[in-house]
Amino acid sequence: MENKQKTATTVKVSPGPLGYVYARRLPPEGLTELALLSARSADSDTAVLPLIAGLTVESGFDVNVAVVVGSRTTGVGGTGVSLKLMPSHYAPSAYVFHGGRHLAPSSAAPNLSLLCDRARVQFGFSSFKPKPCEAEGETTGEALCEHLGLNPNESLLYMVIAEGFKEAVYISNTILHMGGVGTVTIAGEEVRRIPIYPLQMFMPDYCRAVADPFNDRHRAIGEYFAYPLPFFNAKLASLLFGAAVGPAAVALRARNVDAVARAAAHLAFDENHEGAALPADITFTAFDPTGSKAGHRNPRECGGGFEQRLASVMAGDAALALESIMSMAVFEEPPTDIGTWPMLTCQESTAARAASIGAYLGRAAGLVGAMVFSSNSALHLTEVDDAGPADPKDPTKPSFYRFFLVPGTYVAANPQLDRDGRVVAGHEGRPIVPIVGGNHEFTCEHLATLCGFSPELLAKMLYYLERCDGGVILGRPEMDTFKYVSDSAHTDVPCCLCSLDNRHSCAHTTLLRLRARHPKFTSTTRGAIGIFGVMNSAYSDCDVLGNYASFSAIKRMDVQETARAIMQETYRSAVERVMAELENLNYIDAAVPTSPAKLESIITGREALQTVVSNVKQVVDGEVAQLMRALVEGRGFRFREALGEANHAMSLTLDPHASVPCPLLQMLGRRSNLAVYQDLALSQCHGVFEGQAVEGRNFRSQFQPVLRRRVLDMFNNGFLSARTLTVALTDGACISAPGLVSGQHAAAESGFEGDVARVNLGFPKEIRVKSRVLFAGAGPAASEAARARIAGLQSAYQKSDKRVDILLGPLGFMLKQFHATLFPNGKPPGSDNPNPQWFWTALQRNQLPARLLSREDISLIAFVKRFSVEYGAGNFVNLPPNNISELAMYYMANQILKYCDHSTYFINTLTALIAGSRRPPNAQAAAAWAPRGGTELEAQARSVVANPGDHPGAWTTMFASCNLLRPVMATRPMVVLGLSISKYYGMAGNDRVFQAGNLANLLGGKNACPLLIFDRTRKFVIACPRAGFVCAAVSAGSGAHESSLCEQLRAIIAEGGATVASDVFAAAAKSLGARVQQLQIEDWLALLEDEYLSEEMMELAGRALERGGGEWSLDAALDVAREAEAMVTRHVDAEETFDFGAFAEDGPADAGLAVHLQSRRRPLACSDLFGDAPAEKRNDLTLDML
């Protein structure tokens, strides 16, 4: 990844308040949409809303603002006062503190507030406790409604606040300017809004948080200033304590949540603060990373070393400082406007709009499930471990990887230690649970911790988990919710949150249903971080060969040429030309390049298939030859060497408004960013500690600025792409604010002078993620550990010489889809249905009667075999094509690899697991949404399934895989992926630290996503498209390996044979039982990645139901499977059979007419089906070849 120099850009922003309190009557329309997008617990009157133009704020709302953060004395003797402005942006969430009960709760789970309070106590986090003076001076929602002339029982009050100043509202450092009430229009309704300003306005030159805001005699108050009443609302403060401060406190390991809020507020007001912000008495968790002697070791032995604890707090402090810098960022993209959402533009009724939103949130549930159940998710990486010095012989030698994040979810209840490793008061006698080993159980309290102990975010988390699959698609036993609820009426249930009537929707029941997917931590070694991010650009280098022959790589510095001319000779443009030509040939649909629908009208016979394949081959060969000639002759491009530097690459934005409008998804993005910031900071800690007396009391305050500067110096060094802005006020800007003498109830004054405190602003803009295309092996300078690790990978990347089944080869997808058209006589004896598995298995085993083949059949077989053998000999993509687009892209990549003399190893490939949604397939899936439980649960759940239109949120998540990642990335999706950040110095003598964000995989396998498989040559990205839904479409490790049903079925397919369909169905029936009848065609596609087999599975399932008289029976299913097997294995009389093995690969088609008598014998293994392959040719590249 090339290093881009910082460029300064001038942006102009308008001055404005810290935020607004919006007061509105309940909207007559859109309340259901608002409820679906919000996060609200059933036992709370508060909620968190997404900031959406046209729904929660007015259309045209500008998120970038120069907020008033204080005042300064000016003039001779300090007699004048000007306002201090700070660039910022409004937070992507709005906070409802009155009237939230009018919004339908995100989940019907009961007593979530009680659960969060209980979890806080269990894990040692502080609770919300307002001060007596705050309670006395509280501004209630009812009082505000009365002041504005609104009915308190029919009104909604919520706050929109600038990022970085939420904590200031929590600690009562703001005021409501009651004299500045204005009116705006939202969705055709008039809405009142009250500006929010800081108390520091009335304290000139006071650039820090006010510890006692209700003290109207504070000595910092300006002379003759009318000190206002600080804004405190108990419901709002409690909401911010959980939803805004709580997630940060958990991520930073700070048990004192109030102290985190005050530290963040101080950083917001004091832009020059560079020292420590977190308190000196912060505590640390004792944990045993090895898992030995769990529960019996001395807590001081499990607290790690002093430097480990110091690195933990200093990295947390640095991450908080980075987040404060990000709060001052100015972003280009405006907030999303619900009126422009493509998925709503064609919906006329309110119910249809709500159903579209519900369907989209059902998609996002797949990503939330991956973040919760992946064992290396940023949500779980909350503790810091020490790997020790890199060189045991030289402990002072700095290492970027000494300190790293480890999962802390299951050790959160361990004893807390002080700075010196002593157990703090109140934690004596607590057991020490190891990170790995032990009998860990993922409980509701752990889930509350992931949400920062916020009932609102926890309710939204349960909303998504209720839509996740519990393991049906994997063959795992899933809990029968109906039976569980029914039995609980007579048995003891280990849950004090629910009763029989609401047990079906309880958080405990949801986690029990998903028990098979609970995270399991098997290692504490440093590894990848599972993060949630958003692609905000349609551009990515995710073609098969990534950014090979990119614009910057082929540009000649000695020649003046246009950018268009350079771009036309890149690999990317060559790919686009191939795809455009396939579209012109009507082979693919540009909107959905992976769809096989176009070919159905083209392949009407044998010649048509040969024409299609020949045309694809001709188009690709021509483009590759043209590309290589341009690179070699025209540019002198070192095409072989460049292949080793090629990477798949994408960028994830740090713009908080880019997330799909949902408070929980925004929290996932924030937690991911905090994990990344801490990873960077931890890499610099050892260098800061080197040669210093770290035990000194003043060390942290003295060296925290050093660590902060080191982290900031890592910007624009390959991973964190930063942007430098020069901020100025808009021309003719008028600074309006409450009068300092007239007070908060007087009208605003507009005669203020003011200036921007930070004119030059540098902040991270995006993170770059890449994956190397080639497996390079160990270099000569690699360490012994690296060589050993690489040696273990070589076998996974080694290209096998074994021939593959024709149906698993390059043309397999077409041969299966069009078998009935191509070989109408290719059906088992006694059957009327053509069967490709039987036909090609019998053909390759020399068991197919020659009388069944015509001259045209043999000609097509010769063509298929020749192309398959030729493709296989030079194939280095460890994936069979599933459609014509993949065939063209894989063949193109292999041709370029052939020019580059690549051999031996497969290349790395990318796969997108695209989240989708569907209505609940059965009553069990809808149990959590039943209006009534108890004895009526099953009937109510069946009613939800039968009447989906009455339940807009009744959707469940599903997945489909796609091996063409570039069109997926063009939808600017939300993604969940594994990220491993490597750090290294530049050239010799250069102390500049570069980084690379390497794409890795999520740990946890099927727990994270049902379609994840263990394949070292593949990297997976879980994606949920945004373009076409909520934004406009743009034109064109070491986890445990789990053997699941998905892998079993694909192993059966990989083995090949005539009985593939019957074997797959029998295996699925034995594993899933009655759940087979619930699988839809999408489920079979996800399991098998084979459209033909998926349709056959649906047919066999239907026949099994008919055999059982409408009821599912395993015996009937197995009978159907045996009949299908018998149909394709029926023996034929001894006669002449077609000798496929002796069939000439390079000879004329007529050579296949020679047949030989074959005795009945045991079929050969698939690896013996073909003759010897032609020797691989590795000639040097010549102009003649080009």
UniProtKB/Swiss-Prot annotation:
Required for nuclear localization: annotated span: 1160-1186
DNA-binding in keyword set: yes
Gene Ontology molecular function: single-stranded DNA binding; zinc ion binding
Zinc finger (unnamed): 495-508
Motif Required for filament formation: positions: 839-840
Gene Ontology cellular component list: host cell nucleus
Cysteines joined through disulfide linkages: none
Keywords associated with the record: DNA replication, DNA-binding, Host nucleus, Metal-binding, Zinc, Zinc-finger
Ion transport among keywords: no
InterPro entries assigned: DBP_sf (IPR035989), Viral_ssDBP_head (IPR043031), Viral_ssDNA-bd (IPR000635)
Pfam family, one: Viral_DNA_bp
Location relative to the cell: Host nucleus
Gene Ontology annotations of biological process type: DNA replication
Gene3D superfamilies reported in the protein's UniProt record: 1.10.150.560, Viral ssDNA binding protein, head domain
Family designation: Belongs to the herpesviridae major DNA-binding protein family.
Quaternary context: Homooligomers. Forms double-helical filaments necessary for the formation of replication compartments within the host nucleus. Interacts with the origin-binding protein. Interacts with the helicase primase complex; this interaction stimulates primer synthesis activity of the helicase-primase complex. Interacts with the DNA polymerase. Interacts with the alkaline exonuclease; this interaction increases its nuclease processivity.
Role, per record: Plays several crucial roles in viral infection. Participates in the opening of the viral DNA origin to initiate replication by interacting with the origin-binding protein. May disrupt loops, hairpins and other secondary structures present on ssDNA to reduce and eliminate pausing of viral DNA polymerase at specific sites during elongation. Promotes viral DNA recombination by performing strand-transfer, characterized by the ability to transfer a DNA strand from a linear duplex to a complementary single-stranded DNA circle. Can also catalyze the renaturation of complementary single strands.
Name of the protein in question: Major DNA-binding protein
Native source species: Bovine herpesvirus 2 (strain BMV) (BoHV-2)
Gene: DBP
